[in-house]
Design a protein with these regions (language model features):
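N-terminal Rossmann-like FAD-binding beta1-loop-alpha1 element of flavoenzymes
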Residues: 6-32
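Predominantly flavin-linked oxidoreductase catalytic cores and closely associated redox partners
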Residues: 140-230, 251-253
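Helix-loop-beta segment of a Rossmann-like dinucleotide-binding subdomain
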Residues: 56, 84-93, 119-155, 160-174, ...
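Short beta-strand/turn micro-motifs composed of small residues
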Residues: 12, 35, 96
Length: 259
């Protein structure tokens, strides 16, 4: 029996597929990534926020320090490999929206686990109504997911490890310890399709719950350099541009901008 060309076929080159491919190739595995040039990809437009403090109660994510350490090392490896800057730290100024949230904030200030992550904000903010104050969230980071996908795709192409095509599931063939697609054969296939897995005949019955988020790219009217969050968020991107993000919609999940 002929040996398959690849160890893995990876369907989807979003953030998950890209990082998986990078890790497998670093371990000497033969990988082919198949993607339709990120059409409809959430990773392509994602803000890439790494946020240690979340929720109404300003909770520190369990295990954040370990997760962040691992993520930082990974993105540094990608930066060195791709020769681009992918991750940056940014202060986050969060609006305290009511008395209850302000109470949680003052409680967090007295907790040792939160010392490295939260403090009273002493700088000017863009918020007009700060009746309950603002908090500074430290160790927030932004990953440039669009740049990561673009440069990693080129890196794959240069290594003959990328195929730009729409996957027709009916053309996937399975045998013992082998999967084939068009002219490719591999030992395994891994689907990294994000929400598009709802159309995958082998995954469509899983209990997916789709959500639609939207991001506006807007002209900056301020030289404020911190991320602002108040349920929505505003991130300075360049000298002239900022990104404004919304909450999620659970019912309207098409790819069109909302009115």
């Amino acid at each position: 029996m002929p040996v398959p060309q690849f160890d893995y076929l990876i369907i989807g080159q979003g953030l998950a597929g890209s990082i998986l491919a990078f890790q497998l190739i670093a371990r000497g595995q033969r990988v082919m990534v198949i993607d339709n040039d990120h059409k409809g990809s959430a990773s392509q437009v994602a803000a890439g926020i790494i946020n240690p403090i979340t929720g109404h109660r300003l909770n520190l994510t369990d295990g954040f320090a370990d997760y962040y350490s691992s993520a930082s090392k990974l993105y540094q490896q990608l930066e060195q490999t791709l020769e681009v800057s992918l991750i940056r730290k940014i202060d986050q100024v969060r609006l305290l929206k009511n008395l209850g949230q302000a109470s949680y904030f003052h409680k967090r200030l007295d907790q040792d686990d939160y010392v490295d992550f939260i403090e009273t904000n002493k700088e000017a903010s863009l918020f007009k109504n700060t009746e309950y104050g603002t908090a500074k969230i430290k160790q927030t980071s932004i990953v440039d997911t669009e740049l990561l996908l673009q440069t990693f795709k080129k890196w794959l192409v240069d290594r003959n490890a990328y195929c730009n095509t729409f996957v027709d599931y009916s053309e996937l063939g399975f045998a013992v310890d082998e999967v084939s697609y068009q002219d490719f054969s591999a030992n395994r296939v891994i689907f990294c399709e994000g929400y598009q897995a709802i159309n995958n005949p082998w995954l469509k019955d899983l209990p997916f719950k789709l959500a639609k988020g939207e991001i506006l790219t807007i002209e900056r009217q301020s030289n404020h350099e911190s991320m602002m969050s108040w349920g929505n968020w505003l991130i300075p991107s360049t000298n002239d541009v900022a990104k404004l993000g919304s909450n999620y919609a659970w019912n309207d999940t098409d790819l069109q901008p909302s009115d």
